Regions:
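Basic, Lys/Arg- and aromatic-enriched nucleic-acid-binding interface segment
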Residues: 124-178, 182
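Conserved tyrosine-mediated DNA breakage-rejoining catalytic core shared by Y-recombinases
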Residues: 183-222, 235-236
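Active-site/catalytic core of tyrosine-dependent DNA strand-transfer enzymes
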Residues: 145, 210-278
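DNA/chromatin major-groove-contacting recognition/catalytic segments
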Residues: 208-211, 321-345
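Short, polar N-cap/turn motifs at the start of nucleic acid-interacting alpha helices
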Residues: 187-193, 277-280, 299-318
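N-terminal core-binding DNA-recognition domain of tyrosine recombinases/integrases
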Residues: 27-37, 47-135, 151-154
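Catalytic-site neighborhood detector that most strongly recognizes the C-terminal catalytic loop/helix
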Residues: 139, 198-202, 308-333
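Short, basic (Lys/Arg/His-rich) helix/loop patches that form interaction surfaces
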Residues: 155-158, 256, 265-306
Length: 345
């Protein structure tokens, strides 16, 4: 009988893996599978729970982490103490961030259950926040989107022109995410269409290029003949690597994208202050605006879902959920008017 079998027979407790080392293995696998976005969120989830436990290097045995009580303590800590990325912001993470980190932990837990590391508890995450929803309007009104679309780019400061152009192209390309715009290649343009694979899901998308986008593409296209990318969003770092005789790794390219995204969002804030005071602009707004305006124009949720490249209509519904209350309120007003005016008929 082996020592391991003898220990099990005698009832000796099996040593549980540490969450940090286990999650790091998961992150490395995601990196190997080129799932950069997932690896990025898992990395921040690990940093967050490590901070909750007292910092990197502190022991986090998984049988202690994955208990209803400890998960609830972690959730309450995130609501109260979890630091945001921008130090000027108050402590406490948003519900969306809390949900993301909890869902990351839930996925890790299910992986451990599948590997027989931990027993299955179907109610383990019942008391913590794991919802995927949006109660916040990220979409612009029709008039606001029209303001941006009709803006004379020549009147903007030079560093903001291409940023607004990219935002408009994202809207015109059926709410294309910024990451997909950044990774578009010159070869993806097939006549009057763009054929590309979504970075997040790998799903192939075909988008007809509207005439409103033609001029923007012509003016703001990548003019570097050595670059494979359609727009000069990742070109600076790419060129440096080529001059050094090195091939850029996917992970490095993704980090370039994250830097570009941060700069993009900061400049969108400046554009909002100039053109739409009191309105918050971010990379998400173009996508949500397209979905919302399409919804209000009478397009079915099924068509909107397909246009956005969602695998499930449920994902699309989270985009449109903030407007459900508006429809209910409007219907309620019509009902009240109908009842109040009954005797006048």
């Amino acid at each position: 009988m082996s020592k391991k079998e003898k220990n099990v027979e005698m009832g000796s407790p099996m040593k549980m893996p540490d969450l940090a080392s286990y999650m790091q293995t998961v992150i490395e696998q995601l990196e190997a599978d080129k799932k950069r976005s997932a690896a990025h969120t898992y990395t921040y989830a690990l940093k967050s729970i490590a901070e909750f436990y007292g910092g990197a290097g502190m022991p986090m045995p998984v049988d202690e982490v994955f208990t209803p009580g400890r998960l609830k303590e972690y959730e309450e800590w995130m609501r109260r103490e979890g630091m945001r990325k921008r130090k000027r912001e108050p402590k406490g993470l948003s519900l969306n961030t809390i949900s993301t980190y909890m869902r990351n932990l839930k996925a890790v837990y299910h992986r451990m259950v599948g590997e027989k590391v931990l027993p299955y508890n179907p109610k383990l995450f019942d008391d913590v926040y794991t919802k995927v929803e949006s109660q916040t309007k990220r979409a612009l009104e029709l008039e606001q989107m029209n303001t941006l679309l009709c803006t004379d780019l020549r009147k903007l400061p030079s560093d903001l022109r291409c940023v607004l152009a990219y935002f408009l192209l994202m809207f015109l390309f059926r709410g294309m995410p910024f990451i997909d715009l950044a990774y578009l290649r010159k070869q993806d343009v097939k006549g009057n269409r763009i054929v590309y694979s979504r970075h997040k899901t790998g799903r192939q998308m075909t988008v007809r290029i509207p005439k409103e986008a033609m001029e923007l593409m012509k003016e703001f296209k990548n003019r570097n003949p050595d670059s494979i990318y359609l727009f000069p969003i990742l070109h600076k770092q790419e060129s440096k690597k080529k001059r050094a005789g090195k091939v850029k790794k996917d992970k490095e390219l993704y980090m370039d994208y994250l830097r570009a995204l941060r700069g993009f969002n900061l400049k969108l804030e400046k554009i909002a202050s100039l053109l739409l005071p009191a309105v918050k602009l971010s990379s998400y707004v173009a996508r949500h605006t397209w979905a919302t305006l399409a919804f209000h124009a009478g397009m079915s949720i099924g068509i909107i879902s397909k246009a956005l490249g969602h695998f499930s209509i449920k994902v699309t519904e989270t985009y449109l959920k903030p407007f459900e209350n508006e429809k209910v309120d409007a219907a309620n007003e019509e009902l009240i008017i109908s009842v109040a005016g009954y005797n006048e008929k």
